[in-house]
Amino acid sequence: MADVHALYDQADQLKLEGNLEEAVAKYQEILAEDSNYVLAHAAIAVVQGRLGRHDVAIEHAKRVCEIAPEDPFSHTQLSVIYQRAYAGTQNPQYIQDAEDAMARSQMLQQGQQ
């Protein structure tokens, strides 16, 4: 079994160096070991968004919210991923989705469920 923390550090370094495809592959290695490793899902969402793969980015950002449903930041990140997807596609549905995710984040921050 690989050390997911070491793999994450390696993937993060690849991302910083601009090796985005390699970073995604390394993050996927992490998920093969631990499918609920939230940091890997969050990082994949960001990297896939940069690569223009907005559907995949959204899928991973949603997974973060499933793993950590009470974490306001998870929903804020989902909102940002939707905003970037809108910028890349001009699909107006992404704006509504972004607003919904941000509203959920704000409710959680205010202690509402």
Please state what every model-predicted region is.
Residues 1, 34, 68, 75, ...:
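Inter-repeat boundary and helix-capping residues of tandem alpha-helical solenoids
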Residues 2-29, 33:
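Alpha-helical segment of the N-proximal tetratricopeptide repeat
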Residues 17-26, 51-63, 85-103:
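Structural signature of tandem alpha-helical TPR/SEL1-like repeats
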